[in-house]
């Protein structure tokens, strides 16, 4: 009989110290993080190391094995247009999950599980908000990944949070910010109710990221196709 592990620190910071943070080449617009293979639509992404997820289990038997990476998208002039911390596990035995995908004022929230009590398939998005405030107050994992770097983020951004997990302890987690001229997916409709000020195409983009992340968590291949990240100004990232 397999051991049954209980997820107790989904938001705990990883403990891996980063002493050197250099961009890694993104071969063929694909990166591997944990068991997840992330396909990127754009050619100008960079990957940096990030602290592992550090998800502990209640039984005291250590952590669920995981890996994380910081994905940075630059504009043609070199400015940062998006920064996404993506973490994934390799899975470990059985996982008991409690659903905490609840509505939050001012945010778009969609529960891909349909409200199941023992599932965690949640996407949140909002904004645009001041980026420094977002990262320092609401994105601890992204903040930890950015600390070794000297990156100038967009002043105002759309935030996206994602947590997908199954009972085999296969997990994908995202904390990311995308510049305020982000166009999202204009031809798609959000799956949930929009908060004030959030553009529907941004919520639709978050939904699409959620759907492909859920597929990655539950598939043998672990393939995750990042939706197109495009911008509306003359500074658009190709």
Where are these regions (language model features)?
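Short, solvent-exposed mixed-charge patches
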Residues: 236-238
């Amino acid at each position: 009989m397999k051991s049954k592990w209980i997820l107790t620190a989904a938001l705990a910071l990883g403990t891996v110290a980063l002493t050197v943070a250099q961009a890694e080449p993104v071969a063929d617009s694909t990166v591997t993080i944990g068991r997840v293979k992330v396909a990127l639509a754009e050619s100008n992404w960079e990957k940096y190391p990030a602290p592992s997820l550090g998800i502990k289990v209640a039984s005291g038997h250590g952590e669920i094995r995981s890996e994380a990476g910081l994905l940075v998208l630059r504009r043609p002039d070199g400015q940062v247009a998006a920064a996404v911390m993506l973490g994934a596990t390799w899975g470990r035995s059985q996982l008991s999950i409690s659903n905490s995908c609840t509505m939050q004022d001012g945010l778009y929230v969609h529960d891909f599980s349909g409200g199941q009590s023992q599932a965690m398939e949640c996407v949140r998005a909002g904004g645009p908000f001041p980026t420094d405030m977002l990262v320092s107050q609401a994105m601890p994992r992204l903040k930890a990944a950015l600390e070794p770097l000297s990156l100038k983020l967009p002043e105002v951004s759309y935030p996206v949070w994602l947590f997908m997990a199954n009972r085999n302890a296969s997990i994908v987690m995202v904390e990311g910010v995308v510049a305020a001229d982000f166009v999202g997916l204009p031809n798609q409709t959000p799956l949930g109710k929009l908060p004030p000020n959030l553009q529907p195409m941004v919520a639709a983009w978050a939904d699409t990221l959620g759907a492909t992340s859920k597929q990655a968590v539950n598939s043998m291949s672990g393939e995750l196709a990042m939706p197109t990240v495009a911008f509306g100004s003359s500074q658009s990232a190709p």
